[in-house]
Amino acid sequence: MYSIHTVVTSDLGEVDLSVTNLMTGESWWTTFDSGETSQSLLPISGSPGYYEIEYITESGDVYVGEFLIE
């Protein structure tokens, strides 16, 4: 089992986190409150593939990244 561990050290308000395996279509998501000691742990399958990770802050800022699990 794999997990996405996120640590946020600024108060961004509520943050939406989504992870999608672009090869299988599997998706996971959660919402968490950010702050000085805020953390989120999102379990994912860890199946091989290219993944997209997206964070959307309460103010509407969007941060997107990609990673590969072989």
Question: What spans do the regions from the language model cover?
Answer:
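Glycine-centered tight beta-turn/hairpin loop motif at sheet-sheet or coil-to-beta transitions
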Residues: 12, 25, 58-60
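Short proline/glycine-enriched turn/loop motifs at strand-loop junctions of beta-rich domains
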Residues: 9-15, 23, 47-48
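C-terminal tail/sorting-segment detector
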Residues: 52-70
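Short, surface-exposed loop/turn motifs with a glycine/proline- and acidic-biased composition
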Residues: 34-57
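Short, glycine-anchored, charge-dense loop/turn motifs used at functional sites
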Residues: 21-27, 51
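Structural beta-strand segments of beta-rich domains
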Residues: 1-6
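Generic short beta-strand
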Residues: 16-18, 53
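Solvent-exposed serine/threonine-rich low-complexity stretches and specific carbohydrate-binding patches
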Residues: 26-35
